[in-house]
Amino acid sequence: MVAAAAATEARLRRRTAATAALAGRSGGPHWDWDVTRAGRPGLGAGLRLPRLLSPPLRPRLLLLLLLLSPPLLLLLLPCEAEAAAAAAAVSGSAAAEAKECDRPCVNGGRCNPGTGQCVCPAGWVGEQCQHCGGRFRLTGSSGFVTDGPGNYKYKTKCTWLIEGQPNRIMRLRFNHFATECSWDHLYVYDGDSIYAPLVAAFSGLIVPERDGNETVPEVVATSGYALLHFFSDAAYNLTGFNITYSFDMCPNNCSGRGECKISNSSDTVECECSENWKGEACDIPHCTDNCGFPHRGICNSSDVRGCSCFSDWQGPGCSVPVPANQSFWTREEYSNLKLPRASHKAVVNGNIMWVVGGYMFNHSDYNMVLAYDLASREWLPLNRSVNNVVVRYGHSLALYKDKIYMYGGKIDSTGNVTNELRVFHIHNESWVLLTPKAKEQYAVVGHSAHIVTLKNGRVVMLVIFGHCPLYGYISNVQEYDLDKNTWSILHTQGALVQGGYGHSSVYDHRTRALYVHGGYKAFSANKYRLADDLYRYDVDTQMWTILKDSRFFRYLHTAVIVSGTMLVFGGNTHNDTSMSHGAKCFSSDFMAYDIACDRWSVLPRPDLHHDVNRFGHSAVLHNSTMYVFGGFNSLLLSDILVFTSEQCDAHRSEAACLAAGPGIRCVWNTGSSQCISWALATDEQEEKLKSECFSKRTLDHDRCDQHTDCYSCTANTNDCHWCNDHCVPRNHSCSEGQISIFRYENCPKDNPMYYCNKKTSCRSCALDQNCQWEPRNQECIALPENICGIGWHLVGNSCLKITTAKENYDNAKLFCRNHNALLASLTTQKKVEFVLKQLRIMQSSQSMSKLTLTPWVGLRKINVSYWCWEDMSPFTNSLLQWMPSEPSDAGFCGILSEPSTRGLKAATCINPLNGSVCERPANHSAKQCRTPCALRTACGDCTSGSSECMWCSNMKQCVDSNAYVASFPFGQCMEWYTMSTCPPENCSGYCTCSHCLEQPGCGWCTDPSNTGKGKCIEGSYKGPVKMPSQAPTGNFYPQPLLNSSMCLEDSRYNWSFIHCPACQCNGHSKCINQSICEKCENLTTGKHCETCISGFYGDPTNGGKCQPCKCNGHASLCNTNTGKCFCTTKGVKGDECQLCEVENRYQGNPLRGTCYYTLLIDYQFTFSLSQEDDRYYTAINFVATPDEQNRDLDMFINASKNFNLNITWAASFSAGTQAGEEMPVVSKTNIKEYKDSFSNEKFDFRNHPNITFFVYVSNFTWPIKIQIAFSQHSNFMDLVQFFVTFFSCFLSLLLVAAVVWKIKQSCWASRRREQLLREMQQMASRPFASVNVALETDEEPPDLIGGSIKTVPKPIALEPCFGNKAAVLSVFVRLPRGLGGIPPPGQSGLAVASALVDISQQMPIVYKEKSGAVRNRKQQPPAQPGTCI
């Protein structure tokens, strides 16, 4: 069904994109065969197969004729050849000019030899006149109604009036009918207009069944007239219909079981039935098998039911024992006109079935409440007071202690969905309207309700799903507490189910669970379809579980519980999207679901010799018997279908007991050796049965991948488990790194990614602060996680945080500011409800049980009597209220003192209190929802801007596109509109007869002038009707009344209802030959004087006037309807050519002159006027101003076609807009190219600095390409200017180079200084030590020198290089000295000498420092390779 769901979006696009071109497309193949072909006019001329032949037989009949025709061909060929030769000789030229239609014309159409096209009679359209497209009047005593051969046309409306004698019974028999279910309808009225009583609304596929157990539908009209109106939309079309009618026909032709004879008591005909058949149409079996006389029963010939069974027998022909060992169907038929209805509800109290509400075609004899005695099988009389409640349908009923609770539903008179809760007291037959204390509820239609007693003793009514016009399809469970008189919306757990409209639900007392099946659901705003889902809702744990689906999609069906089995009957099963696959609107499918085994079974359909297909019916259970009442199958039904299931106690053996069903679940009681029902089984027997079913069950693993959330994946019976982001069967393992979840309890809670996409409307999406509506795709998406941060909560457009710290007002405010927030301003309902809810949760937690939270909020006292919030909005005392005797004068700051009562208190700001509420703006903007469709009361508001809404013109209602079928399930909407297309509100808005008669409720009143002028009025075939001024109120529906005074024939007015008068000149001409307008006057033209002549505009239809086009001299033509001018000058725009295209460089004043394109000097411009929008342009204007005052101005222009050229000049451009101030320069005609030069001396450019040249190009034809350029340049090189420019550039470059060189030098010097500084720092950081030096002098005695220096002098330093293979050896060198051993003045006596020495062959300890020196030496860093330290 994914493809079906996706196709619904395409279906909606096809509907909203319907155009006139689409409406003109013909349908599929037709079967009106014509053997006549071009070139052989004599053979088989006029040979056609009639429409009444079924399509499969027509090709066969044609083939038979062709096989039998060779002898006839041989006889006719010579005659044909002679006739052809004579025709060629006499009128060869005329034959050459005549054209024959490519395909034969049908339905009375004739081929026009001049055009080769079919000319259709009134009411037929199409290339072959094969589609109906107007009104027909049928007066024969019998005949047929058809839409034409082949498929009917898209977006079409056809109307047939069958006229007979007053109060004569007419029968319409639907031999074939196939239209798009729920969208394309054929309406049948018992009268001469749509204001007569509606008796049927046909839609879908209505084909006689091969089994013969269903009869062809038949409609009866008793007024002597019948009006049939057909409407199809733009989605897809089917084969249409073939309907026969007769005024002298017995019901259903006596069903083939009798003879139609004239009644002895009247002139009418009636059936004389064969033996064993009774009823008006001989369709009721009578005394089958002679009722088993004498053993089982006797035949009662006076009773329609026939058999009177003995006490031990029952069923048809008394063939089933008591208790029943097999199930069977029976049918009870009633003719009371107050009974037929659909979408009603029924409950059983004692032996009485109470039926409440429902939809009816006509409300003249409507009864809100009906009572049916199941024992006597008779309808009981009730007080008229039971009808004091407004008529509604699609509501719910629930019975509790002789009281019937009715909730919701759609009010038929207004089309609004209500949230009323009313109670019907059975004992006194009276209604009471309840006013609940808390109204947290949805107004829904198409829902269900059950009253259950919970394990905690509370008695509640549970309302399941439904459709709400404001919030879309509801997936919530609403709970009404009967004792507290309060509503609440439950927060359920388990699977995330999808709510819908028109589902069925039953309550099983044994499992204490609700079982919900099917429905019409929206899976996003643009995707909607029927469903086959089955959900289980545990009423005590509030847990949803997804059970095995039925594979049969349906809605508006019914279900009951019989001995552990849910029986499902009927419903609308149409689920086709782009073409028909045979799914019917009305079904008689009968299915059973075994609760213990989670298994579906298909049961035999009722074999009752009647059409029992239906939807919108009710079903109740009484004494193991199901009673199905009413419903809709194009007609509203009033019969009762009775299904008696087999009884468990009828089986005497264990094998037969366990084999009972399907349709019932029986259990064998070994103790008593009896077969008992599922309801009486013990817990052990139940577990045993479930274990047996578990071992035999077949799992549908393909269903696992349909679950997109962890909750639904783990809360179903398909044995699935969750792997991070997808659902897989249990026998499939998760990928590496993924976490497998098998139990619902282990799923992450409150993940918005799971539940946001279940919301189908913007309003329902906006209720959850974690979701956001995406208007482009019309879907609800989850906001990013932690959009507010940890500990913060998104509420609307704000982030809220509740703290529990005990602080005074200023400290609480400071805490909020530290988080970029303020104390909360609780000014919206969302904020208040969130804070109160969170406070209740926090207060109930164990950690906070001893702490009372009275949090600070952002409310302060500004002056003596004025309080305002932190966001400076005033306090209104509405969402939150002051507690009694508050606010006190002692406090200046607000606290939420009593959250349970929304009570505020003024507190002293310096007192520390528990808690505070902080608020900061969210970093996303919540998108505002548009006005819901249901609140748009005008067509313009409904259809403007988007395709999300649809406007129903006759109901004056706007509905969601995904809820059209749910809003009009019985064809109430006769025509709908979308995407800014709206019809007039009533008939008076149509100005022509043809448009008037397209509307089924309108007629045309022609005035005495007989020129086609008149007015469109609501009316019937007999004349105009006066519509009621009062809207329907309660159960009062005012009816239109015939009022011939609105179009009196005595005053020479003429009323037209079927066809328009022949003369249709819209009041602007008389007619010759009754239909040809003689001469259109009043500035009009056209075949019917329906348009204005060229140069004038207006709506001349029905006497309207034409007025001249107002184009300010820039156009002579305009749109004849709107008056928008077709401006002839390029650059001039506006409806009246009053503006210039400033955005495209055009300037000027078209009100006093024209518009010019501003040209730049020394540029070439090309204008290509080749688009369709350029068709009307014949002129274009340019303006150019010289840039240089000392140079001449050159120009050239060429074009692809001839044109006229005028060049003028003026002292300034502003003067150029005024006539008479431009001086002509050039005037040329019929040229393609022109060049010229304007001397700066001649035109004195120096004294006219604003001189402007105007170029007028005109009188060209579309399309054209124009090139134009103005330029100024010298004929010789200005050397002075060249050298000045050259040297200026050279010096500039030189200066730039010098500056760059200086900058480079500065950077180099700076880097050198930094490098030297680093070297000095590195040298300063080198290791150092002290050394003792003994300097010998000649005067010193040798004995003073220590022994350590007697050896060879040693170096003062040895600095090894990297690798220890080389070193720098440093020694002291004594320099030459003077006398006395003293160096010369200014010189040193010592010097340090260093040399690079090889130490690779030496021991590493050749030079060893003393241990003390080593300890005092600084640690040096490791040297780089090749670096000496």
Curated annotation (Swiss-Prot):
Cytoplasmic side: 1301-1429
One Pfam family matching this protein: GBD_ATRN
Organism taxonomic ancestry: Eukaryota, Metazoa, Chordata, Craniata, Vertebrata
Occurrences of domain CUB (ranges): 132-248
Keyword Cell membrane: yes
Organism expressing this protein natively: Homo sapiens (Human)
Protein name: Attractin
Tissue: Isoform 2 is detected in plasma (at protein level). Expressed and secreted by activated T-lymphocytes. Expressed at low to moderate levels in peripheral blood leukocytes, spleen, lymph node, tonsil, bone marrow and fetal liver. At very low levels found in thymus. Isoform 2 is the major isoform in peripheral blood leukocytes.
Residues in Kelch repeats: 352-402, 404-451, 461-508, 513-564, 566-624, 625-671
Entry function: Involved in the initial immune cell clustering during inflammatory response and may regulate chemotactic activity of chemokines. May play a role in melanocortin signaling pathways that regulate energy homeostasis and hair color. Low-affinity receptor for agouti. Has a critical role in normal myelination in the central nervous system.
